[in-house]
Structure formats: C-alpha cells, structure tokens
Swiss-Prot record:
Name this polypeptide is given: Protein NrfC
Source organism of this protein record: Escherichia coli (strain K12)
Leader sequence segment: 1-27
Residues that hold [4Fe-4S] cluster 3 according to the record: 92, 95, 100, 135
Classification via InterPro entries: 4Fe4S_Fe-S-bd, 4Fe4S_Fe_S_CS, Cyt_c_NO2Rdtase_NrfC, ET_IronSulfur_Cluster-Binding, TAT_signal, TAT_signal_bac_arc
SUPFAM superfamilies: 4Fe-4S ferredoxins
Domain 4Fe-4S ferredoxin-type residue range list: 37-65, 83-114, 116-145
Record gene name: nrfC
Positions contributing to [4Fe-4S] cluster 1 binding: 46, 49, 52, 172
Its job: Probably involved in the transfer of electrons from the quinone pool to the type-c cytochromes.
PTM annotation: Exported by the Tat system. The position of the signal peptide cleavage has not been experimentally proven.
C-alpha cells in the first residue's frame, strides 16, 4: 500500500493546500497535472462485508438514509454446498463523458480537468435534480441537510486532501479496491488493468466510466 500511496501523492499535494476552502474555490484552484484518477473493483475478491460503505459514511459524514456507495449482492450462484454470491459496487463512475455535467444549468456538476474526478460544487447547486435524472448509473441523490446533489467524489475533499487513499480503499480487508492514476503506466491501477480482464458498466452508452471491474468469474461480463 505504501508504494501505491506514493504513486498518487504527487497528484493530491495541491488538494492539501486548499483544505477547508469553499467548493467554488477548490474547483478553480485544483492543479493536478497529468493525473486522471480511476478505480478497480475486483468482484472476485469482494466478500460483501460493507466495510467500504461504513468507512465512506464515517469519513465523508454521509447522513443515514442516503449513501454514496452501495454493495449489491446477487442471487445465489451455484448449487449447495458450493453456493457463491457476486457483489456489485454501485457508486459514481467518474465518467470522462458525464451526462450529469452536460445537463447541469448552473455549472455545479463538473468534471475536474486536472484530476478526472466528477464532483458537485454545493455553492452553485440549486437542487434542480437534472443531474440525478441524467445519470444512467443512478448514483446521485439530494443531500438531506444541504439540499444539494451529492455522490461519491473519491474522497476528494477528505482523504485525498489529507494525502490518503479513498476511505473505501483503505477499509477493504481483501484489497478488492485499487485506486490511482490511469494516465501513469507505472501506477498500480494501470498495471492491474494490464494483468487482469476487466469490464465497465454500461460502456455502450459512451460515458467512458473510470470505474473498472474484475468480473466475478473470468470471461463473464455483466452489462
């Protein structure tokens, strides 16, 4: 983990410098040159313990009743006693071509060009819910306290600012999550993508999601 942390620390150094600033200022001052963050969820390693969900809620102060991250369990696969479950991560895909960004009338939903992270500026959000309707992955919600759109931001305002990995990655006991710079061929995530077969959910939509998945069974691709 130390090696992978070092791979992306250069990309989050600026984030630490702007800790505590308002969302609008953060969006304008980020300068993470050459970084395009992505994540891999290895379904063959995920055990559905939901430690990632708990860590996300705690670190990002997500109220009960809503969630930035959900682990969905499939129907039983196989026959007793060899029954297995597939666990599917439902969260923001941080699309390069994000429909939520395209429909936002105020510019509150944006894709940070320097890091690739899709985020929401709460100072600009008017709660119109256009982005929620446009997202084909159904991962956005209205925050019950701020009344603005919310979702996974790869812990951009919390762990990344502190030079840490996203909370879900740090909490996973089976190392089913890998996070890093997709544009760095030597990063842990780039090496993993070369080594294992992966798929991306609803890729045919042309959104270019940056959440990759190692399938539950090799050769099995879910759409």
């Amino acid at each position: 983990m130390t090696w992978s942390r070092r791979q992306f620390l250069t990309g989050v150094g600026v984030l630490a410098a702007v800790s505590g600033t308002a969302g609008r200022v953060v969006a304008k001052t980020l300068n993470i040159n050459g970084v395009r963050y992505g994540m891999v969820h290895d379904e063959s390693l995920c055990i559905g313990c939901t430690a990632c969900m708990d860590a996300c809620r705690e670190v990002n102060k997500v109220p009960e009743g809503v969630s930035r991250l959900t682990i969905i369990r499939s129907e039983p696969q196989g026959e007793f006693p060899d029954v297995k479950y597939r666990f599917f991560r439902k969260s923001c895909q941080h699309c390069d071509h994000a429909p939520c960004v395209d429909v936002c009338p105020t510019g509150a939903s944006f894709r940070d060009a320097a890091s690739g992270i899709v985020d929401v500026n709460p100072d600009l959000c008017v709660g119109c819910q256009y982005c929620i309707a446009a997202c084909p992955y159904r991962v956005r919600f209205i925050h019950p306290v701020t009344k603005t759109a919310d979702k996974c931001d790869f812990c951009r305002k919390t762990n990344l600012q502190a030079g840490k990995l996203p909370a879900c990655v740090e909490a996973c006991p089976t190392k089913a999550l890998t996070f890093g710079n997709l544009d760095d061929p030597n990063s842990e995530i780039s090496q993993l993508l070369r080594q294992k077969p992966t798929y991306r959910y609803k890729l045919a939509l042309g959104t270019k999601p940056k959440l990759y998945r190692v399938p539950f069974k090799y050769g099995e691709v879910s759409q």
